[in-house]
């Protein structure tokens, strides 16, 4: 680093911090990718080097598990804050246990106590109050006055601006799960920057950006950007003060592995202290951390046991992140997820694999401390990854059902080799981009609107008539559905849905920027940021199968007293998505492409790039409860299949045929992600550990080599699920983790309704 670029003349500190590191470009500008590419060490070996948990890890994890049991006994929340608004510096230091604090190698809690939920009213005071009251806590009444009379919240602003049509669409769940009652999340700060450069350098870089912003010309875009940069600088200064509370000075760069992990974690802690976004991803940190660990190992200042302890303790902190949520949120996103998504592996653009020993160490946390939903461990997969790593990851999947896989070979050409997963399955260039999260549009209900002329079957007006939510097009009145007529009307109704959906999201994102801006996260992202506009699809497989039924069989309409199509009788057989049958799978591809094209016709906020996803989280239950019967045979008000997963029971040709169908969906039309969740009986993979992990590797290689995007892998039988549902008190189920649509969850933390939904899903007994 040149002397003039060094803040406060601290060249010696940077020299010490960067000793032995290679490369030049990253030393004069913020460029973490360049640093990684010049300094990481590939690892081709197996897991034999890994260390068992230390005594400190066992004691801390044991205490944390006791707290988690207390939390479960109290209905899912151990304690809620009622007197302090969460901020970077609103609390003194907090530890897992005051008597054990000397054992914590990585420190920092969201509040002053472990698992205590912060009070975060900026997204909506009513939501913050309701979240506390749900668990028996009462927020100090002064805050209601402050955040209704003196400080407007995001939620109030959105509902002030909603049109009656938007409110009706939201009420009837044709668009649903919207981030208007919770933080939008999905913004990943490049937390590595805190460790590599220190806060002072980052502040100086942001000050340069502020000086260059606008050149004296003041108009809306420039004014807003100047204000946002100023907020980012303020947030960076706040991070320094937050770290001081724990006795650390993060003004300069980290000088060893322990500091690098601690500095990085402070950056993430700043995010979760100030935002309660639906997804608060950690990002792609493993390779970065490995560089520091390797240097310390080579210098003899760190042992493998100590290195694993640092990773275990950091992971323990990610497992502790909690937010106070309202009941309607928990119905959408069940099981208390945070989406602290953390990626391992992948390939570089130069063809080198990026597997390091620390990738193994992060996966090993699931052995040292048992299965856990958080962090949301994600393997960036390619068949070209080292065989030893693929087999170890497969072993962890078979043993824990806690990790997911995403296809690095389809993401890398678009996002480069330094992207993070910003929620469940969505990629974003680390430190270069941010995403406007937009939940999902209910394309299954949209199909019913096309048949019923825009009226909603479950939702009635005050006089008992079906609500007119969509355009008042002529309904289909024939006894049997005609494929061409249905497709024409469905095309028109999707036009309307795409338009209102995008406009609702434009409004929400505008208000979130205005009233609940993510300054701490955006401070760790380039000022000249690229923005994506993430839409989503719910009910995907049911629409595909319904259109297939109309095209290839005969579908008779059963109408109620209002003339609404309330159920359907299908005569004859039809191809179903999930069986590697192009007749159905081609409809799936058409549906995805068509919806994205319609979304892209509309203006998106801040000139963001529109994308879409096929992803539902556990909200497939909520969406299904709001949607009537469909021509594919799905009964009214029952759960949808999640994400891009084929409908329950539709897969009749085994696991591989199901995977082949999903693999046909083109990722370039769903850059926000295509989520596929499969459950495999252990015996279907083999009769020994070696057979199972080797066969799973073959499945993953074949699936992803076809261009598929994502796979959740569960390896267990239905009997285990049923027993866990009936006997959640059994010790073996305390940390029983399963993969659902895009994330993992402790099975016993799901509602019974959602547990039954998981049990109803296809469990493949054969390949």
Protein language model features and the residues they cover:
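Conserved catalytic cores of very large enzyme subunits
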Residues: 2-767
């Amino acid at each position: 680093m040149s002397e003039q670029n060094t803040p406060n003349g601290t060249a010696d500190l940077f020299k010490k911090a960067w000793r032995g590191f290679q490369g030049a470009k990253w030393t004069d500008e913020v460029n973490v990718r360049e640093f990684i590419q010049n300094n990481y060490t590939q690892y081709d070996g197996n897991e034999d080097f890994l260390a068992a948990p230390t005594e400190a890890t066992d004691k801390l994890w044991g205490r944390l598990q006791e707290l988690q049991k207390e939390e479960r006994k109290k209905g899912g929340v151990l304690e809620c804050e009622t007197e302090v608004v969460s901020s970077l510096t609103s609390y003194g230091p907090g530890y897992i246990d005051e008597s054990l604090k000397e054992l914590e190698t990585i420190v920092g809690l969201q509040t002053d106590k472990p698992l205590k939920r912060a009070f975060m009213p900026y997204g909506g005071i009513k939501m913050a109050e309701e979240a506390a009251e749900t668990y028996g806590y009462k927020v100090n009444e002064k805050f209601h006055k402050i955040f209704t009379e003196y400080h407007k919240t995001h939620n109030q602003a959105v509902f002030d601006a909603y049109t009656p049509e938007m409110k009706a669409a939201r009420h009837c769940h044709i668009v649903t799960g919207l981030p208007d009652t919770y933080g939008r999340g999905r913004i990943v700060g490049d937390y590595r920057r805190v460790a590599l450069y220190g806060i002072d350098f980052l502040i100086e870089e942001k000050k340069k950006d502020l000086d260059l912003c606008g050149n004296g010309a003041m108009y809306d875009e420039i004014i807003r950007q100047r204000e946002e940069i100023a907020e980012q600088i303020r947030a960076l200064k706040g991070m320094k003060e937050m770290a001081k509370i724990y006795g650390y000075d993060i003004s300069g760069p980290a000088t060893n592995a322990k500091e690098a992990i601690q500095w990085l974690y402070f950056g993430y802690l700043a995010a979760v202290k100030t935002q309660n976004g639906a997804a608060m991803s950690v990002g792609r940190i493993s390779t970065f951390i490995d560089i520091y660990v390797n240097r310390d190992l080579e210098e003899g200042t760190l042992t493998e046991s100590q290195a694993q302890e640092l990773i275990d303790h950091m992971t323990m902190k990610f497992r502790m992140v909690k937010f106070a949520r309202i009941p309607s949120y928990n119905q959408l996103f069940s099981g208390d997820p945070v989406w602290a998504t953390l990626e391992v592996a992948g390939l570089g653009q130069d063809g080198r694999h990026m597997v390091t020993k620390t990738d193994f160490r992060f996966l090993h946390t699931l052995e040292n401390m048992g299965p856990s939903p958080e962090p949301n461990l994600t393997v960036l997969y390619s068949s070209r990854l080292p065989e030893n790593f693929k087999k170890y990851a497969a072993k962890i999947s078979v043993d824990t059902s806690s990790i997911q896989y995403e296809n690095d070979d389809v993401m890398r050409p678009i996002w480069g080799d330094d992207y993070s997963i910003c929620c469940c399955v969505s990629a974003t260039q680390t430190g270069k981009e941010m995403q406007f999260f937009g939940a999902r549009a209910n394309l299954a209900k949209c199909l019913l609107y096309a048949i019923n002329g825009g009226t909603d079957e479950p939702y009635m007006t005050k006089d008992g008539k079906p609500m007119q939510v969509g355009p008042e097009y002529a309904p289909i009145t024939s006894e049997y559905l005609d494929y061409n007529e249905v497709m024409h009307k469905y095309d028109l109704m999707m036009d309307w849905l795409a338009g209102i959906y995008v406009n609702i999201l434009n409004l929400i994102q505008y208000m979130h920027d205005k009233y609940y801006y993510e300054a701490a996260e955006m401070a760790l992202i380039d000022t000249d940021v690229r923005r994506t506009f993430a839409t989503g699809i719910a009910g995907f497989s049911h629409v595909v199968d319904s259109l297939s039924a109309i095209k290839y069989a005969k579908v008779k309409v059963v109408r109620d007293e209002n003339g609404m199509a309330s159920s359907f009788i299908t005569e004859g057989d039809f191809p179903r998505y999930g069986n590697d049958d192009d007749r159905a799978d081609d409809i799936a591809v058409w549906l995805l492409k068509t919806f994205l094209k319609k979304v892209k016709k509309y203006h998106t906020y801040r000139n963001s790039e529109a994308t879409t996803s096929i992803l539902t989280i556990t909200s497939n239950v909520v969406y299904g409860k709001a949607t009537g019967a469909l021509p594919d045979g799905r009964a009214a008000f029952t759960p949808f299949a999640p994400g891009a997963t084929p409908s329950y029971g539709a897969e009749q040709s085994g696991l591989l045929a199901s995977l082949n169908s999903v693999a046909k969906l083109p990722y370039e039309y769903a850059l926000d992600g295509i989520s596929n969740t499969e459950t495999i009986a252990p015996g279907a993979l083999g009769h020994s550990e070696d057979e199972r992990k080797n066969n799973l590797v073959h499945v993953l290689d074949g699936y992803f080599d076809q261009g598929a995007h994502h796979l959740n892998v569960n390896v267990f039988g239905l009997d285990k699920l049923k027993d866990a549902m009936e006997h959640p008190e059994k010790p073996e189920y305390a940390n029983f983790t399963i993969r659902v649509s895009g994330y993992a969850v402790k099975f016993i933390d799901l509602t019974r309704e959602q547990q039954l939904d998981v049990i109803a899903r296809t469990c493949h007994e054969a390949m």
